Amino acid sequence: MGKFQFSKQTHNIIHLKRSWQRPVPRHETLHKNMKKVMFLLAVGVMCLTACAQKKGGERGTRQGGHMVINKDSDSTFVALKNETLKKFKQLTFNDTQTGKTMEYNLLVPEGAEAGEELPLVLFMADASTAGKEVTAPLTQGYGALEFASDRDQQKHPSFVLVPQYTDWAVQDDWSTTDEVEMTIRLLEKVCKEYNVDTNRLYTTGQSMGGMMSFYFNITHPDLFAASLFVSSQWDTTKMKDFGRKHFFYIVAGGDQKASGGMKDLAEVLKENNARVDSTSWSAKLPSEEQERLAEELIAKGGNINFIKWEAGSVLPESGKGMEHMASFDYGYKIAAVRDWLFKQSKE
C-alpha cells in the first residue's frame, strides 16, 4: 500500500489550525487561575456554612466564633440596654489558685445593703463574646439584661453576676479550661462579700454558657436551686440524676446539636423514671401568646420543662442565618420562665 498523502487542502487547514495555537499570555493564565481560586473559595465557604448549621453548638459555629448579630435596629433591645447597663459594676477577680484574673460584671440590687439576703443569677454568654471587652456579655443580647430590667428587679430583686471569658471555656469533647472552675470561685467570693441567699442561686447561659451551666449541675450538684439552659447541650451520660433538678431547657428545632441534646436528655430522664413536661411553638408568635403557653406549661407543676421553637421560626423573615445563634434571645424574653426560676429554692 502506498504512503498516505495529505491533500493540499487538508495541509492548509492543519497549518491554519496550528497558527492559532499560539502560547497563552501569562496575564490570561493568571486571570483564569484566579477565577478558579475564587470559585473554590466560594464553594468552601458554602460548605463551611452548611456544616456549621448542621453541627449547631459552639464547635459548629467556631468559624463564626466572633460573629455577633447586630441588634441596633431592635428598638426594644436598645431601650433595655440603655435602661440596664448603668446598673452593672465592672470588676476584676484575682484567682489565687491559678494566679489568673477574670473580669466580670455585677449588679448589686437595691435592698442588699440593708441586710436582706437576696438571690443571685449567674449568666454566662456564648463564645462570640470571648476575648472582648468586659461588657460584651451584657451588650450581646437580652440574656443578662432581662434579669437586670426594672421589671425584674422590682419583682425579684437579685444580684446578677456576668463573667467575661478570655477564650472558649468549654469544647464539644466536654473539655474545659481553668476559667470554668474559676467561675465557681468567683461566685463563692461574691456570696461571701454580699448578702446573697445561697439557697436561691440560679445558673443560666446560652450556647457555651449553657454548656457551663450543665457542667456545674454535674460537678456541683447541690449548688444551684434551678437552671435555665438555652441553645446548649452536654454529655448526657453524666445526667442520670437530673430528674431531681429544677430547670427549663429551651432550644430551636433547627439547631441540630442543641435539639439533639434535648432529645438525648429526654431519653436519659425517661430511663430513670423522671417526669418531663414539654411543648413547642413558633418563636414568631406574639409575646402575649408565648407568655400564655409558658404559663400553661408551668401550671402542670413539674420540675423539668422543655420548650422547643418550631424549626425555622427563630430566623428573620429573610430566612437567613443560623438557628443556633438566632435562638438565644427568645429563651430569655419569656417573663413567665424567669418568674418561675425565682420561685425555686433549695429550702
Where on the chain are the PLM-derived regions?
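Alpha-helical scaffolding within the catalytic cores
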Residues: T139-R151, V230-M239, Q290-L293
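Primarily recognizes the serine-hydrolase "nucleophile elbow" in alpha/beta-hydrolase
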Residues: K192-E193, N199-G243
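C-terminal catalytic histidine-bearing segment of alpha/beta-hydrolase fold enzymes
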Residues: G253-S259, R275-E347
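A domain-start/cap signature at the N-terminus of enzymes
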Residues: C51-L120, T204, M211, L265-E267, ...
